[in-house]
Every structure is written in structure tokens, then in C-alpha cells.
Amino acid sequence: MAEDLSVAELLFNNGHWLYTGFMCHQVVEKTLKAYWCVCRDDPPYLHDHERIAKGCGLYTKMSEEQKDFLEGIKRLNIEARYQDVKDTVARTLNRETTSALLEQTKEMHAWILEKLKEK
């Protein structure tokens, strides 16, 4: 998880907005799944952050802003997407939007880690 966040920062610093977004998606997904493992059993093979958060009980503890963030980051799971979909997503990203995404990812990551400490 921490490595993915470092990779996201490196990608951001080199102007790779789309792949910064993908790594942010990975950070959130892996952190949610870590929480799931502490609360339940093996996490499901899903990439839907909202479903993972609901399944492990975190969703009801989230602010509306955090829930909106989960909804917005869905589109950044580009690993298996067709090139035209990647291109469409890439056109929505720039330094400003990706910087905000990276900061929100760091905040969500830290928040989930705090919730893990409470377990």
C-alpha cells in the first residue's frame, strides 16, 4: 500500500496523470481490503470500492465527501479497459485535478489506517 502511494507520487511528479489516478485507485482498494481482512476473512475479488467498504462495515462510518470520493475514483480502474476508455478518462485529468486526487487518496488511506488501529 505504501509502495503504491510512493509510485503514485513518482508518476504525478513526472506528469503521468492517468497512471497516477490508477495507482490512487490501487491504494484505496488495497487499504480497504486490508481493513476487510482484519474484520472478516479474505476480501472478495472486487474492484468496487463502495461494495468493499460496505462489506467490511466502513461505508457507514464515512462522510459524504469520502463516499463521493469512492464513487469518483471508480473510473480510474483502467488496467483492463479499452484504449478509447482510457483516452476518455485521461482527457479529464491534469496537474490540478490529479493533485487533488492524490491528496484525497492520502487522506482516505490515512483515515482507513486510523480505523484499523481501532480494531
What spans do the regions from the language model cover?
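Terminal alpha-helical segments
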Residues: 1-119
